[in-house]
Amino acid sequence: MKTRIKLYAVLTAAALLTGCGAFNSSESTETTTENKTTTAASDTTTDCCEDKENDCCKDEPADCCGDSAEAVTIGAPEKTDINIGHLNSTAHLLAFVAAEEGYFKEEGLNVTLTQFSSAAELVNGIESDKLDVAFVGSVPTLTFQSQGHDISIFGGAMTNGHGYVIKSEYADEDELGVEILKGRNVASVKNSVQDAELQILLKNANIGIGEGKDEVNIVYFDSQKDAYAALSNATIDAASVYSPYASLAKSQGYRVVYYCAHEEALQNQPCCRQIAKTSALNSNPNTFTAIERAFIKAYHFTQTDHDKTIKDVKKYIDIENDLIETEVYGGYSVSSPDPDKQGTVTLKDTIVDLGYTDDYDIESYYNTDIYKNALASIIAEGSDDIYKELEEHFNEYE
C-alpha cells in the first residue's frame, strides 16, 4: 500500500487530480452502543525501575516512564448519530465495510450512509449539516476550500481508479492510449480528475482539444453517471470512468482507452478524501477519531477478507461480484484511509498552476491529527504488519 507520489513536470504532476459521481441509492445504519473511552496506552504507568538503581528514563523503554509517543487517550464521542455521504464508487468501500462489519457500532456510533450524485451535492450536505462526513474528490474539495467553504480534509478514501472507455468500433483491444480519441466526441465531467488526466495526456501527446479530425472534442456532463450514460447516444464515442464504471463498461462491450494506474504520468494520485466541516472537526475531535478508527479497521478487514469485503460492497454498489473484485483488488485503485497530505498539497499547487482554482493556504483546512491519533490508538491496542504499514506510510507522507 506504500503509495509514492511521483513528481514529474507540471504537466505530469497535474495528474494528481480527482472527482466522482452517481449510481444507485442505499443506506445502512448501526445501532448505537454505550459510549466509551478508548485509551491507546495504559492510563497508569508501572514504574519498571522500582527497586532498581538504573535510570529508567534513560535505560528502559520510553513507555516505562509514561512518555511513549503512542500514548493517546480518546474520550467518548461528543456526537453519536452520524450521517456519511458517499458516491457510487466501489472505491468508497471503507464506509461500506465499517458499517457491515460493525466497526461503527464498536466505536459507539450510529451511522447512516447515503449515496449522492456529485461533489457539489456532498459539500452542500456538509455545509447544511445534513452530513457529518463525506467522501469527495480532491479537486472539487480543493476548489471549494479556495472559495472559502468551511470544509477540511481529515482522511483518505481512494487512490487512482479512473480512465476512459470507447465504443468497440473504434478500438479492437484495450489500452491503446489517447491517440485513438482523435476526431472523437468524448463525454467527461468538468473539474474532475477524469477531465484533468485526459487533458494532461493529450497535451503530453501534442493532441489538441477541439472538433478537428486530429483533435479530441470533450463534451461535459454534470456527473459521471450522466457522462457514462451518454455512450448510448450516437453522437458520443467515448466517456470518462471511475470505479466501477471501467469494469461495467468492459462487461457491456466497450474498450478501455487507458487506466490511470497504468499511465506513468498519472500513477498514485490522491483521489477522493474524507471531508467534514472545519468547525466540527475542532469541536468534536473524539467523534471524528471514532469514525476514523472505524475506517482504519475497515481497511484492515479489506486486506484480510476479500470475499466478505466484496459482499459488503455489493450491498451498496449492486453489480456482479467479479466486477467488484476487479475494481477493488485488480490493481486499478487503492482504498486507504491515509490523509496523504504531501500528495494532496502537491495536487493543490498543481491545479493552481493549471488555473483550476486560486491559490490559498491549505494548512488550516487539513487535519492530520484525527487520523494520527486514531491509528496510534489502534496500534497501541495490538498491531500487525497491516497497521504498521499504515503507520510507516503516514509518517513518510504526512
Located regions from the model:
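Bacterial lipoprotein signal-peptidase II cleavage site
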Residues: 21-33
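Secondary-structure end/capping motifs
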Residues: 282-360
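Sec-dependent bacterial lipoprotein signal peptides
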Residues: 1-18
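Short, glycine-/small- and polar/acidic-enriched structural segments
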Residues: 66-220, 237-243, 256-260, 267-268, ...
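Histidine-centered metal-binding segments
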Residues: 42-68
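Extracellular mucin-like PTS domains
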Residues: 30-45
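Pocket-lining segment of extracytoplasmic ligand-binding domains
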Residues: 138-140, 226-315
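Conserved C-terminal helix/tail region of periplasmic/extracytoplasmic solute-binding proteins
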Residues: 352-398
